[in-house]
Amino acid sequence: MTVETDKQTLGFQTEVKQLLQLMIHSLYSNKEIFLRELVSNAADAADKLRFEALVKPELLEGSGELRIRVDYDKDARTVTIDDNGIGMSREEAVSHLGTIAKSGTADFLKHLSGDQKKDANLIGQFGVGFYSAFIVADQVDVYSRRAGLPASEGVHWSSRGEGEFEIASVDKPERGTRIVLHLKEGEESFADGWTLRGILKKYSDHIGLPIEMRKEHYGEAADKPAEPEWEAVNRASALWTRPKSEIKDEEYQEFYKHIAHDAGNPLAWSHNKVEGKLEYTSLLFVPGRAPFDLYHRDSAKGLKLYVQRVFIMDQAEQFLPLYLRFIKGVVDSSDLSLNVSREILQSGPVVDSMKSALTKRSLDMLEKLAKDKPDDYATFWRNFGQALKEGPAEDYANREKIAGLLRFSSTHDTTGAQSVGLADYVSRLAEGQDKLYYLTGESYAQIKDSPHLEVFRKKGIEVLLLTDRIDEWLMSYLTEFDGKSFVDVARGDLDLGKLDSEEDKKAQEDLAKSKEGLASRIKAALGDDVAEVRVSHRLTDSPAILAIGQGDLGLQMRQLLEASGQAVPESKPVFEFNPTHPLIEKLDAEQDMDRFGDLSRVLFDQAALAAGDSLKDPAAYVRRLNKLLLELSV
């Protein structure tokens, strides 16, 4: 290395300072993870060089043998990670090592909890593993030169992790990046060949290019060669190209951690080779936890794409639908050209066929997880259930398959857990039941005792309880399952079909006819606030209820539209009353029109509250209620 020039001292971005403090104070409970992160970055640099060299072969500078070298010096207390990948220019070193360029930095820091294990996962997901070097090092030196730049445009970046870094220009004949870690006192154990080999074998055996270390020579010093001999300490073959029978679960798990930047294990994986008209290999994973930015519009999604084992791009979104954006993995195709671009991937029979097959394979993987490991599937559902609920709207062809993977709360399970599958629900249908009943609301606590459920409890009929904000929208696309239609128990004039006997139906009609006068009086009292007033067939214990018009938006959809600033179509509820309830009998007998109006209004407002809606004029409700209570106390 020659004399340094153009030396500057620069400050870290504020967010990096915060991150460094977390790292330095042992955020990772497992310190050896630093080597996995730095080797993973070196492998990415090799992938990027391979890809850019497809168009500019001169970037290889006459040497296409890509490798990573890990070395150590016990006396100097250093560990060195050296790669001959793409390298960095001076500007890139400042940008990549001095700032966190990825969007959502504030969100990332906001999600840090102080829990070492959880925060370590976040850091991996966020792709800032370079800073893990400061867990074991009190100084980090980076020497780099971008492929294609002259030797004189090498760069030396150095920092002690204390808020600033130095950067200077140096001569660097070889392209790529060399990172020298000056180990802290107490971390000398990492400057050891046996230790480093063990860590590399544990975390990086799946890396698809050689990770080399110096051969260890024992015995007489005279036997040592003048020049160091390097040997690969990993398999150096892409994991997905190996036969499934030869790959251990631990290898799949470490490969997942490498591509997903996740410290936890996946819940499931599927490794498949397709031969014939199309030829490609896929390795797909279901993560064990959701990234914090799963629902951000610009969150990282898609598979790593390789063509004939040459890395093409991260986050190729074209091979899976958006509702499966949580799936991680690799697809390696023999049918795409090496100069494929994102634009070319937008359409075409090859991509469409691969997308269809990979979607089916992902859903099959989830079906198997649900069947074989229900506890793990419950974990999956807690993390990704709402994303999967987008499926019926996006993927008509797989609607029934997706529906079978959905989980809901129901009146069958009093815990409120979303654990009921539609197949389970269908298996418990009452005799004569040909509809699938559901009720939407803000929370399980809010709707578990809803008046809308009274007649179903009386008849012993299970009702699905849908409490996610997306649920009402979901049900506008998911209209049937197993040949049976879904029915919202809060919508329209409830018809229980064969669940009501002919005698029951005749009695309901006669009762409704006998109360037409009362219905007209209540309608006059409530005026334009209701679309209709009628006798209810839903109620057994409550005096009144509000039903949604058959074509109107429910409360969830209205709230979603309001929250997004969109216009909400005006709709009026249907007021239904229970003619056998003592309060309704008292109302029917009331001759004082003012008092009748107040009673009708109080019943209307109470029905709105029971439905989870807010009152337009809560002060008027309280005033009327107080007035009626005073009259009762006289």
From Swiss-Prot:
What function does this protein fulfil? Molecular chaperone. Has ATPase activity.
Query: What phylogenetic lineage does the species belong to?
Result: Bacteria, Pseudomonadati, Pseudomonadota, Gammaproteobacteria, Lysobacterales
> What is the protein name given in its UniProt record?
Chaperone protein HtpG
Q: What's a single GO MF annotation on this record?
A: ATP hydrolysis activity
Q: Which Pfam families match?
A: HATPase_c_3, HSP90
Return the similarity comment.
Belongs to the heat shock protein 90 family.
Give the quaternary structure: Homodimer.
Keywords attached to this Swiss-Prot or TrEMBL record, sorted alphabetically, are:
ATP-binding, Chaperone, Cytoplasm, Nucleotide-binding, Stress response
Native source species: Xanthomonas euvesicatoria pv. vesicatoria (strain 85-10) (Xanthomonas campestris pv. vesicatoria)
Q: Which gene encodes it?
A: htpG
